[in-house]
Amino acid sequence: MNATIDTVPRLCPPPHPHPHPPTRFRVPLGAVDTHAHVVGESFVPERSYTPPPAPPRNYLAMLDATSMTYGVIVQVSVHGTDNSLLVQTLRAHPDRLRGIAVAPHDLSDAALAELKDAGVVGLRLNTISGGGIGLDRLADYESLCAELGWHLQFLTHADRLAPVAPRLSQLRVPYVIDHMGHFDVDAGPQAPGWKLMMQLVADGAWVKLSGAYRLSKTPPYADTIPFARSLIEVAPDRSVWGSDWPHVGFWGTMPNVGDLLDALADWAPDPATREAILVTNPQRFYGFNRS
């Protein structure tokens, strides 16, 4: 049966057409945007939204416009486990880009080797968006990452990690949590979900200081400041920044990546801390600039 207008997942608006660098500080040389997507045209039916195209040339133009030296492309959920556009983009820019794939747990050794050769350095599990892979096969994905020297990346609300929190503390591979745990800042710092997020990060999780526009009401995202600062305080060497471009699955006013970077001036007022978040930490975690 053909899909009707009512059953087609909601269309997302395009990203801001003119991204700019931050106005409150100068982006240091070697900076890494650790979280963005490229979007093609073939989507899985179980997706949660319908994004406009975000081709590699637009993504690279965004990196250039915002003074980013390197970038990490995260497989977008609407493409499911078809990583072909991700791999194509990584292979075209092997020195500048790394990738995070979404893969079935029983992917062949040859296919995994192809992903690694292209520049994939981790696998993403996703409990939020249709087309993602959940946490039920965490052990399988841990084993894959351990064999390949990869890490795990989680897109989830922090409180949804409660059932697997004891397991996370015993993982044999590093892991990173997207978008500061997708936490509702209105719930406050005493909310169980935030307390769990802080505990996971204190115990060794990496955290992406990304998605401020998803957590906050409006720029300049002042309500995110105490939460981001708390994360940085407990994990200054495991905090990284990401633009989340092209901001899929969002229907508010599209943010400018420069404004998202400017929030980092409030989250990390100290220039040395910002350089760790933008340069030192992500280069180490994603394997950039290795001689």
Task: Identify the function of each model-found stretch.
Residues 53-62, 105-115, 137-138, 192-193:
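Short, acidic/polar
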Residues 108-154:
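Hydrophobic alpha-helical segments and helix pairs
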